[in-house]
Amino acid sequence: VTAMFYEIRTYRLKNGSIPTYLKAVEEEGIAIQKSHLGHLVGYFYSEIGTINEIVHIWAFSSLDDREARRQQLMADPQWQAFLPKIRDLIEVAENKIMKAANFSPTKQAG
């Protein structure tokens, strides 16, 4: 898939909850997300700098593609059952949609 748009989701978690969050996502959540959202560019947690931060980046061919995939994810009963396991760990959520510059390696690799 040629990525035109990148969704960058950043969560600030409650103090000390990164291990719990990552365990839940690794064991259950990521498989559900990947089945609907498609191309995971990366999933990160902070080591230095802003503490208790999670960033995950997803690639989409268009904004319509992103919208359709997000709707499918939200309609999935497995995802709805999973959400309570992480929802209370998240204090602040930020979402950005970005486009790659023409000279970006991500654009050239797409």
Residue ranges: model-predicted function:
Residues 2-3, 14, 36-55, 61, ...:
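Glycine-rich beta-strand-turn "strand-cap" elements at beta-sheet edges
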Residues 5-9, 21, 33, 53-58:
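Short, structured motif recognition centered on aromatic/hydrophobic residues
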Residues 6, 30, 63-67, 93-96:
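Short alpha-helical segments used as structural interaction elements across diverse proteins
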Residues 17-42:
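Short amphipathic alpha-helical segments
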Residues 19-21, 62-74:
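Short amphipathic alpha-helices within nucleic acid-binding modules
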Residues 25, 70, 83:
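Short, flexible helix/strand-to-coil boundary loops that buttress conserved ligand/catalytic motifs
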Residues 27, 73-76:
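Short, conserved loop/turn and helix-capping segments at secondary-structure boundaries
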Residues 32, 77-78:
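A common structural junction motif
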